[in-house]
Amino acid sequence: MPLLPEESQWELLTAAGLRNDFQAAWIEGDDRDAIAAELRVDATTTLECDLATALRWMGVGSPTPILWVGPHAPGWTFALALSWDGADFGALDRRVFDFCYARELDEFYGVPGVYGEEGLDDLYLNDDQGDESDLDPHLVAVGRLTGRFVDRAWLAERRTLCRVAS
């Protein structure tokens, strides 16, 4: 795997429609049923869809969090929160790289779990709070640690749109 992706991670996500707030997690594990159970996903209300379809649910004001969940790389699952209430990714009993960026405030919160990891010394990783310019180095770090960067093929994959049970 190369040290850097072919394209800017944040620019790819922005071009795909993630222009506003962004809360997502890279969750260690391939067992999506177990991860869905830990996230308290309501299995009766799911839809397999692409990112463009999932983004139609962004900010709809759902009383319960809406997630888009699916494979990222071998050993890793990706979850995108589509409602700002989001999900409690920190409550998962497994390794998680949790991102949170509020565009309106231009505020990015550092990603717990990446600091101190080997092989990231060449990246400037602000470990507290930052702005939009801090996103790409953190996305590159997560790509290195999970074994896959975001790319156009990744963006085209279908994942599961679901609600978190209240």
Q: Language-model segments: which ranges?
A:
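Hydrophobic alpha-helical segments that drive targeting, anchoring, or assembly
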Residues: 2-120
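Long, compositionally biased intrinsically disordered terminal regions
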Residues: 93-166
